[in-house]
Regions:
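N-terminal secretory signal peptides that target proteins for export/translocation
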Residues: 1-15
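A "functional boundary" signal
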Residues: 7-8, 31-129
């Protein structure tokens, strides 16, 4: 009888621990800031007609190095695109290289855009030398 009580006690403690861990993980993931992601998506929606506003939105993001990998790649792509559309010379390829490295050889619009702006950066670098 004592063995079954210990078993059920252990099972109850394990269940509570599992619930605690689940809630803790849920809390941690829900506390990540979505503000930057919303700004990225908003900047993307403005890019075609208002690239100057998109540039302002992108430059308002504090500490872009703290973004997730996906958001950092999108940030790099959009910031390069905004600079290009605002006729700001792309002096080096370090920013767009983040997007190129992330999107890699994926067959997507973002990968194509990253490679396009990477080429534009190389063109601007060749002209400036």
């Amino acid at each position: 009888m004592a063995d079954t009580q210990i078993y059920y006690l252990f099972k109850r403690v394990a269940l509570r621990f599992s619930i605690f861990i689940g809630l803790l993980l849920l809390f941690l993931f829900s506390c990540t800031s979505q503000k930057e992601n919303k700004l990225l998506l908003h900047a993307d929606s403005l890019m075609a007609e208002y690239p100057d506003s998109a540039l302002i939105f992108l430059e308002s993001i504090p500490f872009p190095q703290k973004l997730s990998c996906a958001d950092r790649a999108l940030y790099a792509l959009l910031l390069t695109q905004a600079r290009y559309k605002n006729y700001i010379t792309l002096d080096d390829d370090s920013l767009i290289k983040v997007a190129v490295d992330y999107y890699g050889k994926k067959k997507s619009l973002r990968a194509a855009q990253a490679h396009y702006y990477w080429g534009a950066a190389y063109r601007d670098m060749a002209v400036s030398y």
